[in-house]
């Protein structure tokens, strides 16, 4: 049975806030939680949630994870709290540090998250920013590990916008030595600084590829992953993106070009007929709802690691 080790970094703002060993330990711990082989009571600790963006899976999975750990959750609505009236982040962070034991924040600007971490005296977790979605990536790689065991056998192809999800997949791929391919239209590549950070870690620089033809990108791949084309806050770009991403739908034709053991991932919500066909979404090779369940287990493990 795996026991939680205190994470060396007090915060989890980026996938790179963990070492490779810590990342693997969190996955192992998550599997123990999933199989109900471990029970940890963090002495009625309190998790504060600050979500500037809509959320279903992240919000609920954090609340359930904290409850299963024996703690409680306080959900701060930015509209009805003083945050919505413009209270400085440094003031909010210092006050919440006296009420809560850990804070999970979903916001637009990554710099705002870093400002919370700067002024907070308790752990801060990135529950999604425009730059990264590291908790999602933890669940993604737990799902991949459950399917393929050895990460060295994995070729992960992400098809779609080079967004926060793609950025976190790249960083985690670098930590674990996984081949990651990002298939996107020109002009929608992942963040350059993220790519450069990943290349500093990758022992084999050729394991990270940016490809503009989705059919080339899926050759030999055994994980096909997609996300919405228009992220939250990009609703005004939807029409343009729908045109630009034509041909980047994961459908049966694309799946046939991948490995025979390929699985399908999607971080949800999904728009059938856009980034993924309804047929593939509901197919036997889809692991989408297993992936969604794993959000709960990895976040329970993450909270245990930060609070232990």
UniProtKB/Swiss-Prot annotation:
GO terms for biological process: arginine biosynthetic process via ornithine; citrulline biosynthetic process; L-arginine biosynthetic process. InterPro entries: Asp/Orn_carbamoyltranf_P-bd (IPR006132), Asp/Orn_carbamoylTrfase (IPR006130), Asp/Orn_carbamoylTrfase_sf (IPR036901), Asp_carbamoyltransf_Asp/Orn-bd (IPR006131), Orn/put_carbamltrans (IPR002292), OTCase_ArgI (IPR024904). It is found in: Cytoplasm. It catalyses: carbamoyl phosphate + L-ornithine = L-citrulline + phosphate + H(+). One of its GO terms (cellular component) is cytoplasm. Its EC number is 2.1.3.3. Gene3D superfamilies: Aspartate/ornithine carbamoyltransferase. Pathway: Amino-acid biosynthesis; L-arginine biosynthesis; L-arginine from L-ornithine and carbamoyl phosphate: step 1/3. L-ornithine binds at residues 164, 227, 231-232. Carbamoyl phosphate binds at residues 55-58, 82, 106, 133-136, 267-268, 295. GO terms for molecular function: amino acid binding; ornithine carbamoyltransferase activity. Keywords: Amino-acid biosynthesis, Arginine biosynthesis, Cytoplasm, Transferase. PANTHER family: ORNITHINE CARBAMOYLTRANSFERASE, MITOCHONDRIAL (PTHR45753), ORNITHINE TRANSCARBAMYLASE, MITOCHONDRIAL (PTHR45753:SF3). Reversibly catalyzes the transfer of the carbamoyl group from carbamoyl phosphate (CP) to the N(epsilon) atom of ornithine (ORN) to produce L-citrulline. Belongs to the aspartate/ornithine carbamoyltransferase superfamily. OTCase family. This is Ornithine carbamoyltransferase. It comes from Prochlorococcus marinus (strain MIT 9312).
């Amino acid at each position: 049975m795996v026991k939680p080790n205190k994470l060396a970094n007090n915060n989890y703002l980026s996938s790179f806030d963990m070492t490779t060993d810590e990342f693997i330990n969190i996955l192992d711990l998550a599997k123990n939680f999933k199989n109900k082989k471990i029970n940890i009571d963090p002495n009625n600790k309190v998790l504060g949630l600050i979500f500037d963006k809509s959320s279903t899976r992240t919000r609920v999975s954090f609340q359930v994870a904290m409850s299963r750990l024996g703690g409680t959750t306080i959900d701060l609505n930015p509209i009805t709290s003083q945050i919505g009236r413009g209270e400085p982040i440094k003031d909010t962070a210092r006050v919440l540090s006296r009420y809560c034991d850990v804070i999970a924040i979903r916001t637009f600007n990554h710099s705002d998250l870093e400002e919370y971490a700067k002024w907070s005296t308790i752990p801060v977790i990135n529950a999604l920013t425009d730059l990264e979605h590291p908790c999602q990536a933890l669940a993604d790689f737990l799902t991949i590990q459950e399917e393929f065991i050895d990460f060295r056998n994995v070729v992960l192809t992400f098809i779609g916008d080079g967004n926060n999800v793609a950025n976190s997949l790249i960083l985690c791929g670098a930590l674990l030595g996984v081949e990651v391919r990002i298939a996107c239209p020109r002009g929608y590549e992942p963040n350059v600084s993220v790519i450069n950070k990943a290349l500093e870690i990758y022992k084999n620089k050729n394991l990270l590829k940016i490809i503009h033809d989705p059919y080339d990108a899926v050759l030999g791949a055994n994980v096909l992953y997609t996300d919405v084309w228009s992220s939250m806050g990009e609703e005004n770009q939807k029409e343009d993106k729908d045109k630009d991403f034509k041909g980047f739908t994961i459908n049966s034709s694309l799946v046939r070009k991948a490995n025979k053991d390929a699985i399908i991932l999607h971080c949800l919500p999904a728009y059938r007929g856009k980034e993924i066909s309804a047929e593939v979404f509901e197919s036997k090779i889809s692991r989408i709802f297993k992936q969604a369940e794993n959000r709960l287990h990895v976040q329970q493990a993450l909270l245990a690691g930060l609070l232990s």
